[in-house]
């Protein structure tokens, strides 16, 4: 795992200033129908409308623009199932530097197309963490590119936290709780830092697929438990919780696991009621709130809709 100095709340503020000229300030959406369904006051942070179609542009942009000129000259490299790769490609394009993305077999076609569209070089590998990291290391050796890890990178973590900084300003009321999807932990740990900076009394809840529930198990056990084979429709949440991400989150967040049926049902609601094209990973946050209505009843809840890169020919409710 990548070794790094853990970022702090002030790093989120620095990231916000660094990416201000490049990232979109996405809207916060409200719906009376959604409030009635949930029994809570829901504030949806629409990161699926971010550049690249996902929150991950924030972290990638912060990482790319934090490089000095000598580092930037050789470009950047990462491994990604889609959204982070597309985000890094777009961020690298904004600075005019090379980008290499290692992609596992079976990645969503729409996400691969987004990576390629922004000029990155794609390198294929087997769909395992070991294969991803080995191919990344090879590309680094051959090109001199700087590794920008999808979630275990201080610059990325800080950048992801800027979405919640915006959410807190835009909500128009003090939020009681913020719910974000949990995969590798970049968004989750960045959100924690943002809350520590701007709303220390706000609760952080992580929404996670039951078929890839390593974050929930790790937080409950007090140590990383990442020996699992993911089985979930949420392709963006299949990665294992990172070491630095766990170090930040341990003892400071709780997790709710939701099965794929609940996630797909929540995704349909977001499409039909909120009129937003989001991917399954985004829908976990609404599924989590609906799974525990008593916990959220009457509360002001921020939900980060993490991305909207979907394959329209393979929507989850179309499967036999």
Each language-model region and where it sits:
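PLP-dependent amino-acid enzyme catalytic core
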Residues: 1-320
């Amino acid at each position: 795992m990548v070794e790094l100095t853990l970022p702090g709340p002030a790093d989120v503020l620095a990231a916000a200033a660094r990416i201000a000229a490049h990232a979109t300030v996405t809207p916060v959406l409200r719906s009376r129908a959604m409030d009635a369904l949930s029994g809570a006051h829901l504030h949806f942070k629409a990161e699926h409308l971010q550049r690249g179609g996902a929150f991950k542009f924030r972290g990638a942009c912060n990482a790319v623009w934090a490089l000095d000129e000598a580092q930037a000259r050789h470009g950047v490299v990462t491994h990604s199932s889609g959204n982070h790769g597309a985000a890094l490609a777009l961020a690298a394009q904004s600075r005019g530097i090379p980008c290499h993305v290692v992609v596992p077999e079976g990645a969503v076609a729409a996400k691969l197309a987004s990576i390629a569209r922004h000029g990155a070089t794609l390198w294929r590998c087997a769909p395992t963490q070991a294969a991803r990291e080995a191919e990344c290391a090879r590309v680094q050796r051959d090109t001199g590119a700087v590794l920008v890890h999808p979630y275990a990178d201080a610059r990325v973590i800080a950048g992801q936290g800027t979405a919640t900084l915006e959410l807190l300003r835009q909500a128009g009321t003090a939020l009681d709780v913020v719910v974000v999807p949990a995969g590798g932990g970049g968004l989750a740990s960045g959100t924690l830092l943002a809350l520590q900076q701007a709303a220390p009394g706000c609760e952080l809840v992580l929404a996670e697929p039951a078929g890839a529930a390593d974050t929930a198990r790790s937080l409950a056990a007090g140590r990383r438990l990442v020996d699992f084979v993911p089985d979930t429709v949420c392709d963006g949440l299949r990665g294992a919780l990172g070491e630095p991400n766990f170090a930040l989150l341990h003892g400071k967040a709780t997790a709710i696991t939701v099965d794929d049926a609940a996630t797909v049902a929540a995704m349909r609601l977001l499409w039909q009621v909120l009129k937003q094209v989001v991917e399954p990973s985004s829908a976990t946050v609404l599924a989590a709130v609906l799974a525990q209505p008593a916990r959220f009843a009457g509360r002001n809840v921020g939900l980060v809709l993490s991305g909207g890169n979907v394959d329209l020919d393979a929507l989850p409710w179309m499967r036999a």
